[in-house]
Amino acid sequence: MIPIPRMPLVLLLLLLILGSAKAQVNPAICRYPLGMSGGHIPDEDITASSQWSESTAAKYGRLDSEEGDGAWCPEIPVQPDDLKEFLQIDLRTLHFITLVGTQGRHAGGHGIEFAPMYKINYSRDGSRWISWRNRHGKQVLDGNSNPYDVFLKDLEPPIVARFVRLIPVTDHSMNVCMRVELYGCVWLDGLVSYNAPAGQQFVLPGGSIIYLNDSVYDGAVGYSMTEGLGQLTDGVSGLDDFTQTHEYHVWPGYDYVGWRNESATNGFIEIMFEFDRIRNFTTMKVHCNNMFAKGVKIFKEVQCYFRSEASEWEPTAVYFPLVLDDVNPSARFVTVPLHHRMASAIKCQYHFADTWMMFSEITFQSDAAMYNNSGALPTSPMAPTTYDPMLKVDDSNTRILIGCLVAIIFILLAIIVIILWRQFWQKMLEKASRRMLDDEMTVSLSLPSESSMFNNNRSSSPSEQESNSTYDRIFPLRPDYQEPSRLIRKLPEFAPGEEESGCSGVVKPAQPNGPEGVPHYAEADIVNLQGVTGGNTYCVPAVTMDLLSGKDVAVEEFPRKLLAFKEKLGEGQFGEVHLCEVEGMEKFKDKDFALDVSANQPVLVAVKMLRADANKNARNDFLKEIKIMSRLKDPNIIRLLAVCITEDPLCMITEYMENGDLNQFLSRHEPLSSCSSDATVSYANLKFMATQIASGMKYLSSLNFVHRDLATRNCLVGKNYTIKIADFGMSRNLYSGDYYRIQGRAVLPIRWMSWESILLGKFTTASDVWAFGVTLWETFTFCQEQPYSQLSDEQVIENTGEFFRDQGRQIYLPQPALCPDSVYKLMLSCWRRETKHRPSFQEIHLLLLQQGAE
């Protein structure tokens, strides 16, 4: 039972993101450094209102750079009532900016200047400047409290801009210096503004008001909105229920802009979109609400007109009717084909299908046109094709895309080479270390040490500081969020004992990338928890395996003909798990072990069977699993009873309990206080079963074994509520919905996993403690629902990121109705962020024993 080779966890999160992405820009992953710290923004594109000296010029205002005198410093002290000093960055093209990082002037310990606050002004064309405001109208952002730390601030809402000015703010006269970085990505939509009627208010039957205005629109707002961008381009799609929102601390209806039918005299809402250049449009995607029970539906048809530069609107429109949906109230993206029409402006008329129409996002799929075409359809005689030799369309976006594609190809080739090289050496090592079994099925194991490393060394060689990529990728921690590498490098801290006993995906030391010499955070790997027969595998550290390898294990051979197969419990890639009845098992079991069955009665057993066509690696893994299972001797752990290995298929025979697994057992029962005549379970019985689970896990942790899939589905129930921990719940189709599958290979029980297991691939006894807390929660809810049943798999991973950041936004499982405060307090202690602050299984077991005696 050892870990199977892993894939980078980043691929999981990227797959989740790519699989669910609907918008052109996803703010959760659009968090790349744009080139201040890496040097990709040239000095001439960094300007300032003034400078103290040549050594504190604007070009020295780069995050993590110590060049010059260590930062940009304005000529005079900043006054609270005279905010005229600024640092300006020209990004050359429009960018979607989601995050700002700032530092003061450290200068090797000689600098003390920093900006405690700042404002942001931005422009898309260099002439009209806009003051950034958050969702509540506040303009001032928190800055630094010392000259050396990097302070990262999310822009909520994000901005679309080419020019950005950072304006230092103080509450008293003081000298300030700044080093900055902007984070985001290229704005591929090319949209520079949209004009639309102002959103309206929806009054619920109870009198509550839902504000459906575009609250972050950065243009002029009156009865209509002109020359700006806002919520329709912020990359955030609204929920099915428009009264709910993704965002924190905002009002109901924030995600949507909505209009009432009676406000439109012609039965439609007209929105005009202006773009940065003439573009070739493929599709338009509109995210609409369809909560028809409240009179909200998607539009029934749309007509779009096109215009190139300053010409008139073309008479030929794109018309697209829709089939209305009165069955599914889910919000959805509506894709409108635009038939490769060319234009720099589009005017669309969205026709009402009901009382209300609500949009949360509008995106366009397009490419920059390589020549000026009127955009009319070829068959239209009313709009002849023209060509203006004086017009040159800037194709910088195209060059950037080509460069990115070439870079991606080289990266993929490098990854393939690394994977092949790793597999080659893995096979060589396996051949060198694998031993053959003797006639008594003796297995000797010596596994390489598995540990996690976090490179906090900031020094780097000159060769390591060279970077040719335009952007250094900040890998996502969840589908909707990622932290820049400069920040998260400091965060994970684990006690030495946990690192020694942990079983994790091997985390490679981070390699510095970029002139700043700051190492990227070490990438975690996906750990495949499945064994060859489909069940989860225990994680056994190298120290423990070295102790086991010195002992010969003789396992009794069981006559295969005595196995009476009843049903298949589950299956894996190379084997199956069957429920069988056997007679005469007493002759083959250990003398110190008593079967939980009456004399001369058939015994229920679980038989793990390896298929005859399994490869050599699978056979060795199966035999290693027998080696480990044979050492587990505890009243609350499933025992290995016998094996069948004289011929194929190889089998191992383990205990099974007459009441099946705890999940099914509890779901068939009700609390004792219930008035129902159905089977009941008392609170004392629940506590008794939980205590046994803790006892079994205490035994495993004493051996430094990590279960990695502790849940009620992996706890078997015998007579008198006895519990034994098993390991084949993962193989059962019945519980396939409890696991998230990645690329058809690894399956992860993410709803039971700790944040460090999901994000760092790290499995320790502390991560088993987390899973025990979830198992305890299942027990006291009588397994009536899945943990976090209200969240999708992507949202569960998103919540994991909240545990990582620890900003008070994480969602905990609620206290079950039958659960006393003392037990729920125990659950919460199992879900503490820091692994060293979680209780041990010895402490948990003792606490449950004490509570049971009260």
UniProtKB/Swiss-Prot annotation:
Regulation: Present in an inactive state in the absence of collagen binding and phosphorylation by SRC. Tyrosine phosphorylation enhances the affinity for ATP and the catalytic activity.
Transmembrane segments: 400-421
Region Disordered, annotated ranges: 452-471
Gene Ontology annotations of biological process type: biomineral tissue development; cell surface receptor protein tyrosine kinase signaling pathway; cellular response to angiotensin; cellular response to hypoxia; cellular response to transforming growth factor beta stimulus; chondrocyte proliferation; collagen fibril organization; collagen-activated tyrosine kinase receptor signaling pathway
Top EC group: transferase
Binding site for ATP: L569, G570, E571, G572, Q573, F574, G575, E576, V577, K608
Any one cellular-component term (Gene Ontology): apical plasma membrane
Induction note: Up-regulated during osteoblast differentiation (in vitro). Up-regulated in cartilage from mice with osteoarthritis.
Intrachain disulfide bonds: C30-C185, C73-C177
GO molecular function: ATP binding; collagen binding; protein tyrosine kinase collagen receptor activity; transmembrane receptor protein tyrosine kinase activity
Phosphotyrosine PTM sites in chain numbering: Y471, Y735, Y739, Y740
EC number(s) reported in the record: 2.7.10.1
Chief location category: membrane
Alphabetized InterPro entries for the sequence: DDR1-2_DS-like, FA58C, Galactose-bd-like_sf, Kinase-like_dom_sf, Prot_kinase_dom, RTK, Ser-Thr/Tyr_kinase_cat_dom, Tyr_kinase_AS
Disruption-associated phenotype: Mice are born at the expected Mendelian rate, but fail to thrive, resulting in much reduced adult body weight and dwarfing. They exhibit shortening of long bones, irregular growth of flat bones and a shortened snout. Young mice show shortened growth plates in long bones and impaired chondrocyte proliferation. Likewise, cultured fibroblasts from mutant mice show reduced proliferation.
CDD domains xrefs: FA58C
UniProt disease annotation: Defects in Ddr2 are the cause of the smallie (sli) phenotype. Smallie mice show distinct dwarfing, with reduced body mass and reduced bone mineral content. Mice also have mild craniofacial deformities, such as protuberant eyes and snub noses. Smallie mice have a reduced life span, with about half of them dying within 6 months. Matings between male and female smallie mice do not yield any offspring. The levels of circulating steroid hormones remain at a level corresponding to prepubertal wild-type mice.
Assigned protein family: Belongs to the protein kinase superfamily. Tyr protein kinase family. Insulin receptor subfamily.
Subunit and interaction comment: Binds hydroxyproline-rich sequence motifs in fibrillar, glycosylated collagen, such as the GQOGVMGFO motif, where O stands for hydroxyproline. Interacts with SRC. Interacts (tyrosine phosphorylated) with SHC1.
Protein name per Swiss-Prot or TrEMBL: Discoidin domain-containing receptor 2
UniProt organism field: Mus musculus (Mouse)
